[in-house]
């Protein structure tokens, strides 16, 4: 098999993003990267490492602390024929660019009667740990799911991170590309060649017949581990990664729910008015056996993101609580069953700062 098509190698999530960016920039001169610290030696957790030395500062543009201006430059240049990749190292501070994202990027194609395209990607990094607390740990993907004209994608695996970024850069619409810091060192098999992971197509990561578990972003890793714990209790969980949140593949989820009769949605965000609420609503509207389906949602506790490790452990859903909730949902009541789940060997706590 030619080297360019190798599929058996294992690389990290961050390396997959870096590789996709490098290959796209080499293939298409209209692709460029801009953001705060994109040329830093640490390379935004390794995702932009060595890009500046390879492509120059005209295509890897370090920007000042001005999120609104950064995003405005991206939206304007995309309308002029470029394909910018904006890097916002903290999703929290994308709030400073909401006018550019919502009133300009998302609406220009419609407002100009289809004459204008806005092919820009906004890499928005979310996460937790290292005591980042209220203003540096928020997951705000649900905000952007509410806006017509924006696409939202949140890949979990290195394979899907590379393919989803390629699809996002090639798309003619603005895309919010959500990535979790604690996934950056997550390893998986990734082909060397360029390929696309399409929007609106979920991936079944584990098949099962007793319960459907849908996990978003980093929560998916915990869901897989929870499914293994449930298997030890003779419960077969089907685990689905939506990957694309807007548009979302409701058909794959509904087909699974009609088979299992139980649905647990685990969001990497707050549950009120969030992605889990949207998924549950879509299932209610589309599933054929509503009266026989039991559903439950899990997500962040509905309080401000905490700083201390003790509170973080209570705040974020983990595999133990996911398995316990899934088991009790199937049984139709609270039980005394306790899952046997070991500490995650796949994910490292983020140790900061960049």
State where each predicted segment sits.
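Thiamine diphosphate
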Residues: 1-174, 178, 339-354, ...
């Amino acid at each position: 098999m030619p080297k360019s098509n190798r599929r058996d190698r294992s690389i990290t999530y961050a390396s997959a993003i870096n590789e996709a960016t490098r290959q796209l920039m080499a293939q298409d001169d209209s692709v460029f990267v801009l953001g705060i610290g994109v040329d830093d030696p640490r390379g935004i957790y390794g995702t932009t490492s060595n890009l500046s030395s390879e492509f120059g500062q005209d295509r890897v543009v370090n920007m000042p602390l001005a999120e609104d201006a950064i995003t405005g430059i991206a939206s304007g240049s995309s309308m002029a024929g470029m394909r910018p990749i904006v890097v916002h190292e903290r999703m929290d501070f994308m709030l400073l660019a909401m006018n550019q994202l919502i009133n300009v990027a998302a609406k220009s194609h419609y407002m100009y009667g289809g004459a204008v395209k806005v092919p820009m990607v906004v890499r928005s990094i979310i996460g937790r740990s290292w005591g980042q607390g209220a203003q540096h740990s928020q997951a705000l993907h649900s905000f952007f799911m509410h806006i017509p004209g924006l696409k939202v994608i949140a890949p979990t695996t290195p394979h899907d991170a590379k393919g989803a970024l390629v699809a996002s850069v090639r798309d003619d619409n603005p895309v919010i590309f959500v990535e979790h810091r604690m996934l950056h060192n997550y390893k998986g098999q990734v082909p060397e060649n360029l390929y696309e992971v399409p929007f609106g197509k979920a991936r079944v990561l584990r098949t099962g017949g007793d319960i459907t578990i849908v996990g978003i972003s980093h929560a998916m890793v915990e869901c897989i581990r929870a499914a293994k714990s449930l298997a030890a209790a003779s419960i077969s969980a089907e685990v689905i990664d939506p990957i694309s949140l807007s548009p979302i593949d409701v058909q794959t989820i509904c087909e699974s729910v009609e088979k299992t009769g139980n649905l647990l949605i685990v969001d990497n965000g707050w549950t009120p008015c969030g992605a889990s609420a949207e998924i549950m609503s879509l299932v209610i509207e589309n599933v054929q056996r509503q009266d026989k389906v039991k559903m439950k949602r899990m997500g962040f506790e509905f309080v401000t993101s905490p700083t201390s490790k003790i509170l973080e452990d209570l705040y974020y859903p983990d595999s133990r609580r996911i398995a316990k909730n899934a088991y009790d949902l199937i049984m139709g009541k609270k039980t005394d069953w306790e899952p046997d789940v070991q500490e995650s060997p796949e994910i490292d706590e983020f140790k900061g700062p960049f």
